[in-house]
């Protein structure tokens, strides 16, 4: 897998994961089963491919939290101790994570073949993903265009859901942008505590590229990289293909804002979205930033305030306001 951030890298994939296969589950959905931390892989880049117990448990807890919050995500089937010692900044017990996903194909998977100009492989990969995730498109004349449009809409919805629960991914490169539009790779991620629009938790993100407020900007950039790999599938005429994908990408912000408007209205207790609820949400976020109020705690206290009819419960979140 490639993993575009500021430059193209040939093999920036998951250096410690092995895809075992897939299985049709009881709900009729086919899911991949992957081991993370099992040892060296083609993408290890000199690493040992092992995982310490800390990062494994973190991914288990956060991915399951995201699932139960209703956010599309890979899931954790099990945590296994390997009996080995893993040496990083400290020595810790070795562990493996059994991870499941509807697909582990990322934008970086398409880039891997594109950088080698392996167009036949790109076509096969696109057809595979259409057949697997969007079988209703298989016989459509414009299936590749529609496939890309669905990914853009899915990613816009996903990032809106991240923002609605205060989730900061931390490493939104193309290798971590899932074609199935699920949250994948829980590395330097975190949930927002005191609200800051530009909050960053990743120690490697010195310039705030993946800051909370930038997530809705990075996602369409990543999707543009996907578009570049499939232009030839959309039209033999490159100029025509560019116009098609530009139009689809232009709608990312509209789709993101529409999703976030609905989610933010619900967080405020309204059944339906209106411009007034959107304005209220924005004003509340501004107050939270000035008052350094806890993101989740503030919204939780809204409910408690109504139940107990005590405004001080809500106002206590803003004790730092002058």
Could you say what each language-model-derived stretch is?
Residues 4, 8, 206-322:
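Regulatory N- and C-terminal appendages and interdomain linkers associated
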Residues 4-139, 157, 179-182, 222-223:
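Conserved ATP-binding subdomain of kinase catalytic cores across diverse folds
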Residues 77-81, 173-176, 242-246:
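Beta-strand segments within the central parallel beta-sheet cores of soluble alpha/beta enzyme folds
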Residues 151-162:
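Phosphate/ATP-binding catalytic cores across multiple sugar-kinase/actin-like superfamilies
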Residues 69-73, 80, 129, 133, ...:
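A generic secondary-structure signal for well-formed alpha-helical elements
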Residues 91, 164-169, 173-232:
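Catalytic activation segment of kinase domains across protein kinase-like and atypical kinase folds
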Residues 43-49, 136-145, 204-212, 241-246:
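Glycine- and acidic
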């Amino acid at each position: 897998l490639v993993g575009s951030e500021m430059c193209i890298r040939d093999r920036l994939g998951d250096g410690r994961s092995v895809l075992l296969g897939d299985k049709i589950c009881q709900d009729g959905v086919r899911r991949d089963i992957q081991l993370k931390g099992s040892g060296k892989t083609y993408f290890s880049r000199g690493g040992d491919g092992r995982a310490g117990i800390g990062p494994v448990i973190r991914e288990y807890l956060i991915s399951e939290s995201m699932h139960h919050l209703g956010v599309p995500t890979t899931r954790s089937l099990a945590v296994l101790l390997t009996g080995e010692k893993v040496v990083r900044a400290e020595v810790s017990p070795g562990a493996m994570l059994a991870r499941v996903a509807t697909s582990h194909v990322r934008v970086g998977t398409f880039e891997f073949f594109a950088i080698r100009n392996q167009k036949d492989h790109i076509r096969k990969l696109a057809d595979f993903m259409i057949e697997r995730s969007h079988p209703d498109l298989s016989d459509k004349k414009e299936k590749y265009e529609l496939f890309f449009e669905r990914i853009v809409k899915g990613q816009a919805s996903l990032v809106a859901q991240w923002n609605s629960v205060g989730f900061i991914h931390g490493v939104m490169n193309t290798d971590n942008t899932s074609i199935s539009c699920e949250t994948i790779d829980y590395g330097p991620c975190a949930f927002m505590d005191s609200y800051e629009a530009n909050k960053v938790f990743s120690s490697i993100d010195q310039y705030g590229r993946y800051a909370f407020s930038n997530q809705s900007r990075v996602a369409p950039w990543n999707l543009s990289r996907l578009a570049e790999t499939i232009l030839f599938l959309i039209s033999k005429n490159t100029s025509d293909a560019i116009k098609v994908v530009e139009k689809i990408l232009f709608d990312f912000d509209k789709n993101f804002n529409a999703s976030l408007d609905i989610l933010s209205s619900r967080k405020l207790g309204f059944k339906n979205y209106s411009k007034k609820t959107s304005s209220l949400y924005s004003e509340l976020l501004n107050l939270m930033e000035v008052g350094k109020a806890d993101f989740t705690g503030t919204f939780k206290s809204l409910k408690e305030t109504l139940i107990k009819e005590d405004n001080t419960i809500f106002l206590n979140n803003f004790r730092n306001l002058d």
